[in-house]
C-alpha cells in the first residue's frame, strides 16, 4: 500500500451607476516579500478545477516528425489500452475515472512511450492533467526492492505548498494499491523538522525547498527518472520560482524525462518551456468556448469600504449554508476582517502567505473537513485548490492587476475566473458575489462583464429579505448556469 512520508508538515444605498462617489484610495498590493499589505499569489492564469471546456480540441505537435499518427497509441479512448499495471487501473477506478479526458487521450500515450520523451502541455485545472502526470510517474517508478522504494525516482514541482499537498493526495489515492510506494513532501517548514534523508519513491514539493534539500544531500537525485513542473505560468509570475526550477533541473540526471504543464503560453512561457523541456512533444488546447457551469454571478453595491464590511457581516448567515471563501486583496485586509468578525462573535478563519506553514496546513484541513465554514484569504487560494463543499465565493475586493506607474485600475480577468471557480464544483450549484464600493471598482466590474461577454446580476441591498431569497433560491436550485461567451 502507498504511504506518505510526513517529511514536512506538509449595504446599503442605491445603484452605484446612479450616483457619483469619490474613489477610495486603491488597495493595490505591495510586492516586497514581508509587507503586511502583500497580495498573496501571482495573477492566476485562466482556468480552474471545474471550469469545463465542452468544445475544445487538443492539437499535438510531435518532436519526432516521423512519428506515426495512425499508431494505436497516438490517442487512446480507454485506460486499459495503455497496458497499465492493474493496480494503477484499480487506483484510477477508486478515483472514479472511467475513461480518459481529452487531454489524457493525447498526453498519456506520449508520456508513457519508450524511450521516454519530454512533454510540454497546455492544460487548465479540471482537464485531468494532474492525473496524467501522476499516472506517468507511478508507471515509471521501480518498487521491486525496499531500497528502491526509499529512493526518489519521480519529482513533481508545484508553485505553492497547498497545491503540492493536493498533488500528494492524488498520488496517494491513485497509487494506494501499489505495495511499497512511499510519497515524500518537500515544502517549506521548520528546518529543524527536516529528516536527515528523504526516503520516498515519489517526491512532491516547491522549488526552493527541493533545491535546498538536494544541496544538503537530504534528497539524493541521481535515480530520478521523471521531473514534472506543474503550472509553469504561475511559477514564472512569482518572483524567482522559474529560476529556481532551472537550478533544480541542473542538479538532476541529464536523461530525466521532463514534463511541463501550463494553463497559458504567452511568449515568455513558451521560451521558458523550450529551454526547460527541450525537444518535447507539445499539446495545446484549441478553445472554442469556455463555460462555467453551476455558478450564479451577482454583485452588491456598497457606499464605501466600511459599508463593504457591514454588508459582509449581514451576509454571514448565508455564508454558513455550505462553505464560503472571502477573497481580499491584501494580507492586512484579511487579518483586519477576521479580527473584527471574531470579536463580534462570528466563526471565521483567515489563510494568507504570511501565516506559519504548519498553521496554514491546519486551517485548510479544517476547511476541507467542514470544521471551518468561512475562510478569508488572498490569491494564495485562488488557484487549483479543490474543496467540494464551497457554495459561495465573495470578491470582497475585485481582483486587479498590479501595474506600477499606471493610474487606471485594471481588473484581473484570469484571477476572477479562478476565484469564482472555487464554487459550483463537481456539479453542485454555487454563487459568486462581488462587492463594488466606488467608481473604479464599478469600472473593473464592467471590464469583467465585457471581457467574458456575460452579465453579472445586481442585487439591491435595500431589501435584505430579497437578497437572502435570491441567494437561497440559487443555492437550492439543481443547477444555476452562467456562460461566458466565445473568446
Curated annotation (Swiss-Prot):
It is an enzyme of class 3 (hydrolase). It is found in: Cytoplasm; Nucleus, Nuclear pore complex; Nucleus membrane. Residues 110-283 form the Helicase ATP-binding domain. The keyword Cell membrane does not apply. Its EC number is 3.6.4.13. Pfam families: DEAD, Helicase_C. InterPro entries: DEAD/DEAH_box_helicase_dom, Helicase_ATP-bd, Helicase_C-like, P-loop_NTPase, RNA-helicase_DEAD-box_CS, RNA_helicase_DEAD_Q_motif. It catalyses: ATP + H2O = ADP + phosphate + H(+). SMART domains: DEXDc, HELICc. One of its GO terms (cellular component) is cellular bud tip. It is a peripheral membrane protein. ATP binds at residues 123-130. PROSITE patterns: DEAD_ATP_HELICASE, HELICASE_ATP_BIND_1, HELICASE_CTER, Q_MOTIF. Its main location: cytoplasm. Keywords: ATP-binding, Cytoplasm, Helicase, Hydrolase, Membrane, mRNA transport, Nuclear pore complex, Nucleotide-binding, Nucleus, Protein transport, RNA-binding, Translocation, Transport. Residues 1-51 are annotated as: Disordered. Residues 28-38 have a biased composition (Polar residues). It comes from the Eukaryota. A motif (Q motif) lies at residues 77-105. Residues 311-467 form the Helicase C-terminal domain. The Q motif is unique to and characteristic of the DEAD box family of RNA helicases and controls ATP binding and hydrolysis. ATP-dependent RNA helicase associated with the nuclear pore complex and essential for mRNA export from the nucleus. May participate in a terminal step of mRNA export through the removal of proteins that accompany mRNA through the nucleopore complex. May also be involved in early transcription. Associates with the nuclear pore complex. This is ATP-dependent RNA helicase dbp5. The lineage of its organism: Eukaryota, Fungi, Dikarya, Ascomycota, Pezizomycotina. The gene is dbp5.
Amino acid at each position: 500500500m502507498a504511504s506518505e512520508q510526513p517529511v514536512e508538515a506538509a449595504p446599503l444605498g442605491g445603484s452605484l451607476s446612479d450616483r457619483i462617489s469619490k474613489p477610495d484610495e486603491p488597495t493595490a498590493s505591495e510586492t516586497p516579500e514581508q509587507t503586511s499589505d502583500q497580495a498573496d499569489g501571482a495573477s492566476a492564469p485562466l482556468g480552474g478545477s471545474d471550469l469545463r471546456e465542452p468544445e475544445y480540441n487538443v492539437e499535438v505537435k510531435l518532436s519526432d516528425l516521423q512519428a506515426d499518427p495512425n499508431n494505436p497509441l497516438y490517442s487512446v479512448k480507454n485506460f486499459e489500452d495503455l497496458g497499465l499495471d492493474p493496480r494503477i487501473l484499480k487506483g484510477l477506478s477508486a478515483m472514479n475515472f472511467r475513461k480518459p479526458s481529452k487531454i489524457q487521450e493525447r498526453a498519456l500515450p506520449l508520456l508513457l512511450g519508450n524511450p521516454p520523451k519530454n512533454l510540454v502541455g497546455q492544460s487548465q485545472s479540471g482537464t485531468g492533467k494532474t492525473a496524467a502526470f501522476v499516472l506517468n510517474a507511478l508507471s515509471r517508478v521501480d518498487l521491486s526492492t525496499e531500497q528502491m522504494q526509499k529512493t526518489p525516482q519521480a519529482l513533481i514541482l508545484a508553485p505553492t505548498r497547498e497545491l503540492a499537498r493536493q498533488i500528494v493526495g492524488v498520488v496517494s489515492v491513485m497509487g494506494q494499491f501499489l505495495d511499497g510506494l512511499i510519497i515524500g513532501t518537500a515544502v517549506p517548514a521548520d528546518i529543524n523538522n527536516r529528516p536527515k534523508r528523504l526516503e520516498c519513491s515519489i517526491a512532491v514539493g516547491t522549488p526552493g525547498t527541493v533545491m535546498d534539500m538536494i544541496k544538503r544531500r537530504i534528497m539524493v537525485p541521481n535515480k530520478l527518472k521523471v521531473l514534472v513542473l506543474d503550472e509553469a505560468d504561475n511559477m514564472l509570475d512569482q518572483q524567482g520560482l522559474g529560476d529556481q526550477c532551472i537550478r533544480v533541473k541542473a542538479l538532476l540526471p541529464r536523461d530525466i524525462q521532463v514534463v511541463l504543464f501550463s494553463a497559458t503560453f504567452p511568449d515568455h512561457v513558451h521560451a521558458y518551456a523550450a529551454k526547460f523541456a527541450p525537444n518535447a512533444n507539445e499539446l495545446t488546447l484549441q478553445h472554442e468556448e469556455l463555460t462555467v457551469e453551476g455558478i450564479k454571478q451577482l454583485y452588491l453595491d456598497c457606499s464605501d469600504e466600511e459599508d463593504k464590511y457591514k454588508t459582509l457581516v449581514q451576509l454571514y448567515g448565508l455564508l454558513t449554508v455550505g462553505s464560503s471563501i472571502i477573497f481580499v486583496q491584501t494580507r492586512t485586509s484579511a487579518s483586519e476582517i477576521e479580527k473584527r468578525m471574531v470579536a463580534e462573535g462570528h466563526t471565521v478563519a483567515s489563510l494568507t502567505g504570511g501565516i506559519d506553514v504548519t498553521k496554514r496546513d491546519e486551517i485548510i484541513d479544517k476547511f476541507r473537513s467542514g470544521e471551518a465554514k468561512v475562510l478569508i484569504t488572498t490569491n494564495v487560494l485562488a488557484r487549483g485548490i479543490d474543496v467540494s463543499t464551497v457554495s459561495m465565493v465573495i470578491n470582497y475586493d475585485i481582483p486587479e492587476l498590479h501595474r506600477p506607474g499606471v493610474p487606471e485600475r485594471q481588473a484581473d480577468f484570469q484571477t476572477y475566473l479562478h476565484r469564482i471557480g472555487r464554487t459550483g464544483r463537481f456539479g453542485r450549484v454555487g454563487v459568486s458575489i462581488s462587492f463594488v464600493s466606488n467608481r473604479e471598482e464599478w469600472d473593473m466590474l464592467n471590464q469583467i462583464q465585457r471581457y467574458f461577454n456575460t452579465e453579472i446580476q445586481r442585487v439591491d441591498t435595500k431589501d435584505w429579505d430579497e437578497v437572502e431569497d435570491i441567494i437561497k433560491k440559487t443555492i437550492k436550485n439543481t443547477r444555476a448556469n452562467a456562460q461566458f461567451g466565445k473568446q
